[in-house]
């Protein structure tokens, strides 16, 4: 494929993803600069797409050191542990995820288990996935400062928690070593907990946040640079009220070293680097804020390992779409 054709394909990819131009704002759903490494969490359709058991640990410290007026550290932190593997007897793959997301005085722990059915489309694979999730959300309302001390919504509330069930659905399509495209919905039910207080004037409750994800990427190589793999990709995350766009580009040298940059629309520029030694990959990114509010930068580190499996399948010479 010549350079002109490659560039045209990349342009089409980004136009498709960003054609629905909604104003980008901050939102509650967890965000990752290394979003290409957390496919299985955001899209159950990806489960089992690669030839092995993949385990990922990802930790993000957003706005590191940010505090409130009382000196309490309220910067968001997110830890994700996920894994997926092919499951031939079920014609697809399985995935699990455990995530803790802390934002100020709010703490969320999410556990998920999912399955993806793989359809062979002749040269490409479509994964159709569903995952059930349990979310435990807790908030220490006693630490919140209301504009009105007698705010009826906060009357009788202290440190409250509730458990909610929801599920995710996803489609993930990939052409080996060529193109991938995914669309998913997280928290389809948008579940609501029982009332947290008995206030007759106003009651408070927790809800899960229905979030839509789209992701696409196009790994390719130039004939004159066979030792380099370029991976442009883009993602959209939206809960309708707010939308976030990411666009990134990576270069991978000899399948060992990777370097890249990520732009999160109207929020940050992320610098990314990674190294792969056999089946172990370590990745790091640093986000430089562009909001102009004096917010500190964000750190993210990921560690992943692939346990190779002999699945007695017809040999296929391609790599996973995971690129650190």
Regions found by a protein language model. Give the residues of each.
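Sec/Tat signal peptide C-region and signal peptidase I cleavage site
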Residues: 21-26
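Bacterial N-terminal signal peptides that target proteins for export
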Residues: 1-11
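Subset of outer-membrane beta-barrel
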Residues: 27-324
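Bacterial N-terminal signal peptides
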Residues: 10-20
